């Protein structure tokens, strides 16, 4: 149930929504509803959508960073690479854990972190 003033839904852009959908469906098992010029996703921990745009989300240009949690960060890194992602910031330590950043096939930047 939605909670007052809590993040309820997230949307991000993609110049190639089909490539973004294929990546997240195959790598993480997300489910999608396809609409004209819009994809709604479920099964990601937070529901959201992908809309067509020439813009992509990158940390270097001030975009928000969506960070996934992993029980096995090395396995997650291999998984995203196997499904076409590019590692743009190799795994590094920070207080509380480790993380890496990757670009999915359509160009958006994400990260995966672990406390293990």
Language-model-derived ranges and their functions:
Residues 10, 20, 24, 76, ...:
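Hydrophobic pocket/interface hotspot
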Residues 29-63, 109-115:
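Conserved short beta-strand elements that form part of the metal-binding/catalytic scaffold
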Residues 61-88:
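Mid-chain, well-packed structural core segment of small domains
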Residues 9, 20, 38-41, 65, ...:
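Residue-level detection of beta-strand scaffold positions
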Residues 1-19, 47, 64-66, 116:
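N-terminal beta-strand motif that seeds the catalytic metal site of vicinal oxygen chelate
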Residues 1-3, 12, 26, 33, ...:
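Vicinal oxygen chelate
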Residues 16-31:
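Amphipathic alpha-helical segments
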């Amino acid at each position: 149930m939605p909670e007052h003033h809590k993040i309820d839904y997230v949307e991000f852009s993609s110049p190639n929504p089909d490539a973004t959908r294929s990546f997240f469906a195959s790598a993480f098992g997300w489910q999608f509803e396809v609409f004209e010029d819009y994809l709604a996703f479920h099964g990601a921990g937070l529901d959201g959508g992908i809309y067509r745009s020439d813009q992509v989300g990158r940390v270097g240009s001030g975009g928000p960073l969506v960070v996934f949690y992993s029980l096995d960060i090395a396995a997650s890194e291999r998984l995203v690479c196997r499904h076409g992602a590019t590692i743009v910031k190799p795994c590094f330590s920070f207080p509380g854990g480790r993380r890496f950043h990757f670009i999915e096939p359509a160009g958006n930047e994400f990260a995966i972190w672990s406390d293990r």
